[in-house]
């Protein structure tokens, strides 16, 4: 058993660490509130983009836009979002396990895989995989929002260009879904082709609404030009919404991780204090025994 001085040193060390984790918990909580506001602000835009693309594609199905229609799958692409920093529990590793399972299934089916990674954690993880080709990387920095959005937009455009050129036949988005402050879960959603995003029932219902005159669109320019631009905006909206939601997940996961670390530090301190009291009691008992032995000898 350690002596009393060593135990006191350990207690002080754990207390110092506890102060750091407690401060990080408060910082993460503050950042999480801001991230949730941004996430909620962008959701109406993403939902509107969903509705518009669903309605327009149902009414404009005659135009052979490469983003709309299914084709034989020989190669797929993934846009994987992660964090640039750690200390956020199992947020990143759970996401990587989820998407890696899908990637392995594709490789077993002899389907090639291209990956666009957002965040240094995903970049470091997928760089170690031999059968995965990283074609673009980007990072989201909350301090440089405009620069980050431009960088991410450029990385996403690489994947869109590859899809248009027929170099990939499916495009997926892998990110974390914000369920609550204490729960985040990995999510894999189809971005392209757009036809695969909606169920057969949704497509049929939208076609019926369009033919019955429930709604219609008047195009000021050529429908092909409008549809091309709309498809790109739709993908950008999905990616931006996923990135902001992933940022909220990161701060929530970090807050909970730091809270758990702070609570665990309290448990360790309690155990160390108990050990210290046992050592101190043993020392006192030994001293009393020595005094009694000396008195008896006299």
From Swiss-Prot:
It is found in: Cell inner membrane. Its main location: membrane. GO terms for molecular function: ATP binding; proton-transporting ATP synthase activity, rotational mechanism. One of its GO terms (cellular component) is plasma membrane. GO terms for biological process: proton motive force-driven plasma membrane ATP synthesis. Belongs to the ATPase gamma chain family. F-type ATPases have 2 components, CF(1) - the catalytic core - and CF(0) - the membrane proton channel. CF(1) has five subunits: alpha(3), beta(3), gamma(1), delta(1), epsilon(1). CF(0) has three main subunits: a, b and c. Produces ATP from ADP in the presence of a proton gradient across the membrane. The gamma chain is believed to be important in regulating ATPase activity and the flow of protons through the CF(0) complex. This is ATP synthase gamma chain. The lineage of its organism: Bacteria, Pseudomonadati, Pseudomonadota, Gammaproteobacteria, Thiotrichales. The gene is atpG.
């Amino acid at each position: 058993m350690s002596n009393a001085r060593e135990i006191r040193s350990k207690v002080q060390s754990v207390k110092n660490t506890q102060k750091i984790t407690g401060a990080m918990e408060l910082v993460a909580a503050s950042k999480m509130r801001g991230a949730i506001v941004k996430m909620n602000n962008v959701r109406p835009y993403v939902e509107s983009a969903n509705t518009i693309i669903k309605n327009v594609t149902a009414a404009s199905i005659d135009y052979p836009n490469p983003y709309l229609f299914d084709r034989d799958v020989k190669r797929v692409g993934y846009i994987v979002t992660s964090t640039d920093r750690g200390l956020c529990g199992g947020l990143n590793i759970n996401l990587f396990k989820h998407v890696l399972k899908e990637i392995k299934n594709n490789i077993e089916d002899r389907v090639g895989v291209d990956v666009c990674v957002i965040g240094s954690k995903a970049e470091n993880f997928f760089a170690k995989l031999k059968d995965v080709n990283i074609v673009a990387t980007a990072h989201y920095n909350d301090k440089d929002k405009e620069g980050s959005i431009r960088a991410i937009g450029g990385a996403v455009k690489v994947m869109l260009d590859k899809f248009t050129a027929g170099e990939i036949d499916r495009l997926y988005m892998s990110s974390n879904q914000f369920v609550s402050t204490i729960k985040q879960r990995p999510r894999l959603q189809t971005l392209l082709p757009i036809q695969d995003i909606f169920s057969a029932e949704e497509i049929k219902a939208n076609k019926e609404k369009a033919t019955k005159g429930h709604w219609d669109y008047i195009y000021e320019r050529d429908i092909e030009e409008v549809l091309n631009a709309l498809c790109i905006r739709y993908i950008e909206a999905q990616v931006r919404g996923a990135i902001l939601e992933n940022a909220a997940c990161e701060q929530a996961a970090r807050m909970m991780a730091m809270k758990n670390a702070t609570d665990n530090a309290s448990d360790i301190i309690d155990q160390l204090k108990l050990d210290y009291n046992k050592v101190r009691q043993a020392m006192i008992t030994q001293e009393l025994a020595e005094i009694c032995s000396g008195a008896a000898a006299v």
